[in-house]
Design a protein with these regions (language model features):
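Conserved positions within tetratricopeptide repeat
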Residues: 40-43, 47, 126, 198-201
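Extended glycan-interaction surfaces of carbohydrate-active proteins
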Residues: 1-10, 54-180, 202
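Well-ordered alpha-helical scaffold segments within catalytic/enzyme domains
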Residues: 18-36, 103, 107-120, 185-196
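Hydrophobic, small-residue-rich alpha-helical packing segments that form membrane-like cores
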Residues: 1-58, 68-72
Length: 202
């Protein structure tokens, strides 16, 4: 379950990059405490996870979610089947899928803030931020249809929660067409860290 109020089935950048950041933070804390074996374990998991995400989730423009439905609903305890996307995990609705998520690099943003360095290949991070501006930015909201909550109107510009430049799932996650300032902030700060000043300040 995640901050989009949905269950994502399969590896996705938002949770994956948070995980990489947690591994790096745990490594640093373990080294400080003299727990070198645990630090090495965290580093090994981080390096393997980083390589896997860059190789498997980066599509050349941004990181995307690989939807992996369960083969059998009984693989998850019934008490954990809550919220959107939980009705039938063998055919889950409300998934991100191939969308360009506004805060897919939120873990990278926090890693920079905490001095933990890059969690992914820097060239991929920079390209992803450019893609977020390319696909998610709306200069105004006049022609934008949103069947959910509206937090920007008229001539206000904003970054959509997600865009679908190639294909969209039949039932994407519910908030994809909304805009939310906090999520925009993580993308903007990420752009500033990468020297994309004009985009970040926009």
């Amino acid at each position: 379950h995640n901050t989009m109020d949905v269950e994502y089935y399969g590896p996705n950048p938002q949770m994956g990059v948070w995980y990489l950041g947690a591994l790096r933070a745990a490594e640093e804390m373990a080294r400080y405490l003299g727990e070198d074996d645990f630090a090495a374990r965290c580093r090994n998991l981080f390096e393997r996870g980083k390589a896997w995400i860059d190789e498997n989730l980066f599509n050349g423009e941004y990181y995307e979610h690989q939807i992996r439905p369960l083969k059998d609903k009984s693989e998850i305890a019934p008490s954990l089947l809550i919220g959107m996307g939980a009705k039938d995990p063998t055919k889950p609705d409300y998934q991100l899928g191939p969308g360009c998520l506004v805060d897919q690099l939120v873990g990278q943003y926090m890693a920079h803030v905490c001095g933990l360095g890059y969690l992914l290949e820097p060239v991929n991070v920079r390209q992803t931020l450019r893609s977020i501006m390319k696909y998610n930015l709306r200069e105004n909201m006049y022609g934008h249809f949103n069947c959910m909550r509206s937090f920007a109107l008229g001539d206000e510009s904003a970054l959509l929660m997600a865009s679908y430049p190639k294909e969209r799932p039949k039932n994407p996650f519910s908030y994809f067409s909304e805009v939310m300032t906090g999520f925009e902030y993580t993308a903007a700060v990420g752009m500033l860290y990468e020297g994309q000043m004009d985009d970040g300040l926009k």
